[in-house]
Amino acid sequence: MGNNVVVLGTQWGDEGKGKIVDLLTERAKYVVRYQGGHNAGHTLVINGEKTVLHLIPSGILRENVTSIIGNGVVLSPAALMKEMKGLEDRGIPVRERLLLSEACPLILDYHVALDVAREKARGAKAIGTTGRGIGPAYEDKVARRGLRVGDLFDKATFADKLKEVMEYHNFQLVNFYKAEAVDYQKVLDDVMAIADILTSMVVDVSDLLDQARQRGDFVMFEGAQGTLLDIDHGTYPYVTSSNTTAGGVATGSGLGPRYVDYVLGIIKAYSTRVGAGPFPTELFDETGEFLCKQGNEFGATTGRRRRTGWLDAVAVRRAVQINSLSGFCLTKLDVLDGLKEVKICVGYRMPDGREVTTTPLAADNWEGIEPIYETMPGWSETTFGVKERSGLPQAALNYIQRIEELTGVPVDIISTGPDRTETMILRDPFDA
């Protein structure tokens, strides 16, 4: 039996993690975010009602689940309050269900200003960040000058620290980026107005999780973005600023690494990517447009159109290696309905003619790569809303089997629609 289950993306994000976390939390006591910030966009559809969460864990919609934001998450007080209000306006009691680590770094206005100024300065070489201050906040954390949730317990000291760090960043904004300085008093006033709300939710997350482990409680760890956006293992520098892989669970929550029991990798039936960066299987033809339209591939956070392409088994195998995946959840299978043929990338042809079956790490080394495809028959029957494996077309079953063969990982869950009811659980991670 797996008490501590990790759910993470195996591609470039947007795989459908939010729905699956929400579904599996029916049995969980706690749901923990361990990395990223409000650059995530987790979409849940419950009884036809759509909810988009950016910062608060997806378990917040469950009455008997406690949601936790761990120390690996960079926390925007403004974004958190906005999201809390949106949920509370719908009658969802967030403050009674949400806990914070006091070690969460804070994202403040100057982080956002730096993020925007840097992207503007990069011009055509822009990374394609969400412009929400995620990277600059992680920079401050590593540089040991960042402000954290726990600093709000001593408001006078917080004000002094804020003044010092803002002098540093405003100097960059004005003198290097030729941008406007951020007003110190406004930042201080905005944070102080909600400081007591934030500190009232603080808990020792590592200790809480250890006690939960000893009691045998079920805990779900919710990843954001995807493996191929990991700061170390992704398509650097076109990556996010945190560890999106399973290793981030221990460092971003305080759970001992030996206590992770099952790692569920969410894999979309095709590939998508938002923003710049390598994407070998990207489609620029009518099939790419079909995938975008049928899959409603527009970012939940930015609204940007996602780039679309065929499933890249080479890249997914890298995710399998890094995360030691226990099983897959295959999402958006129904988007492929109606295609005469479907393709899977099984290797890369390098510019010098060599054929390889592993991914490069640096983005520059992806240039000139051509995907090697395996083509399979498509299916005309609908898979949308199918709730039994036996109800899937044989061609769809063959596609699923081929994914398992190419990756060495079983497909334990199949999603055939956006609602939590449109799901087949072939093997429950909490029972694995």
Curated annotation (Swiss-Prot):
Gene Ontology molecular function: any one: magnesium ion binding
Annotated residues for binding of substrate: A300, T301, T302, G303, R304, R305, R306
Cofactor details (free text): Binds 1 Mg(2+) ion per subunit.
Residues engaged in binding IMP: D14, E15, G16, K17, N39, A40, G41, H42, T130, R144, Q225, T240, R304
EC class name: ligase
Reaction catalysis annotation: IMP + L-aspartate + GTP = N(6)-(1,2-dicarboxyethyl)-AMP + GDP + phosphate + 2 H(+)
SUPFAM superfamilies assigned to the protein according to its UniProt record, in alphabetical order: P-loop containing nucleoside triphosphate hydrolases (SSF52540)
Gene Ontology cellular-component terms listed: cytoplasm
Keywords: Cytoplasm, GTP-binding, Ligase, Magnesium, Metal-binding, Nucleotide-binding, Purine biosynthesis
Entry annotation: catalytic residues: D14 (proton acceptor), H42 (proton donor)
PROSITE patterns: ADENYLOSUCCIN_SYN_1, ADENYLOSUCCIN_SYN_2
Required cofactor(s): Mg(2+)
Keyword Transmembrane part of the UniProt annotation: no
Listed EC numbers: 6.3.4.4
Pathway membership: Purine metabolism; AMP biosynthesis via de novo pathway; AMP from IMP: step 1/2
Subcellular location: Cytoplasm
Binding site for Mg(2+): D14, G41
Binding site for GTP: 13-19, 41-43, 306, 332-334, 415-417
One of the GO BP terms on file: IMP metabolic process
NCBIfam families named in the record: PRK01117.1, purA
HAMAP family in alphabetical order: Adenylosucc_synth (MF_00011)
Record's subunit section: Homodimer.
Family in the record: Belongs to the adenylosuccinate synthetase family.
Primary role: Plays an important role in the de novo pathway of purine nucleotide biosynthesis. Catalyzes the first committed step in the biosynthesis of AMP from IMP.
Protein name: Adenylosuccinate synthetase
Originating gene: purA
